[in-house]
Design a protein with these regions (language model features):
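N-terminal [4Fe-4S]-dependent radical SAM core
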Residues: 2, 14-18, 25, 164-211
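A short acidic, glycine-rich active-site loop
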Residues: 24-35
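Alpha-helical packing segments of well-folded alpha/beta enzyme cores
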Residues: 37, 41, 96, 244-251
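Radical SAM [4Fe-4S] cluster-binding motif and immediate context
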Residues: 182, 187-263
């Protein structure tokens, strides 16, 4: 199945909106984090046989019109769209989903990220253009949803979703966190193929840098960080040392300009 992963546009006229930041914002420094959650989900779906498309609108400071023009370069009538979100941008993200649904009424649109995970039913209530919410860590959820849609199977059997029902809304069975993170392909390979490392900036790292995950889950409950409570949980999991070193070697051999790796 064709899956279009999108980091939607938001207030492009003011700068680059860093939706992946702990506190999503357009900053004076121009900080822009890589959309790592989208990247890993796209990689996992591609690894499992699905054809992917990817648009990071903030990275190129694209507005809605420019983003929709790029999206329409592909035949997306029956595609699965996966849109990242954040609390500051949620109303704009839903409006963008509406525009996609108007273009492709037979498509299936799923919202992901911290905000819809925390407020799944409320987010679904914003618009009928949104077909589902993927709750929490969504690599496996999106892959399984794409499998079900492609085969015409009952999507209510897919774990990790919030969907509409005759009685309002229903949450399917919980999708357990991925145990073996070595199953995920290298984010750096995806960045090399689909993105440009010079579009991203992390103030604490020497520019240009690359960001990757070496683990997921955090046992702490810092009141300034939403990710353990919404995305990756409190049980720490890590990639193997060999797997991480392999990605470092890939970066060293394929990104001559990169000065630092942020983990």
């Amino acid at each position: 199945m064709e899956i279009y992963f999108i980091n939607p546009p938001f207030k492009a006229e003011f700068g680059k909106f860093s939706r992946e930041s702990r506190s999503p914002a357009i900053t004076k420094s121009g900080a822009l984090y890589y959309p790592l959650w989208l990247i890993y989900a796209a990689l996992y779906s591609e690894k499992n046989g699905h054809k992917i498309h990817f648009l990071d609108a903030p990275a190129k400071q694209l507005n809605e019109e420019q983003s929709l023009e790029i999206i329409q370069r592909n035949e997306n009538e029956h595609s699965l769209f996966v849109l990242d979100t954040s609390t500051p941008s949620i109303k704009s993200d839903v409006d963008f989903a509406k525009k996609i649904k108007q273009l492709y009424p037979k498509s299936f649109i799923t919202l992901v990220g911290t905000h819809p995970t925390a407020c799944a039913e409320e987010t679904l209530s914003y618009s009928s253009a949104v077909d589902a919410i993927a709750i929490g860590e969504y690599d496996c959820i999106i892959k399984d949803l794409a499998d079900a849609l492609e085969k015409g199977e009952n999507i209510y059997t897919v774990r990790g979703l919030c969907l509409r029902s005759d009685n309002g809304y229903v949450r399917t069975a919980i999708m357990p966190p991925m145990k073996n993170l070595d199953d995920l392909p290298y984010a750096a390979k995806f960045i090399k193929e689909y993105l440009n490392e010079k579009d991203y900036f992390f103030a604490a790292a020497t520019y240009p840098s690359i960001q990757i995950f070496t683990g997921r889950g955090c046992p702490f409950r810092c009141n300034f960080c939403v990710y353990p409570q919404t995305m990756h949980g409190h049980a720490f999991r890590s990639r193997s040392a060999e797997n991480v070193v392999g990605e470092f070697e890939y970066i060293a051999n394929n990104f001559q300009d990169v000065k630092e790796v942020v983990i």
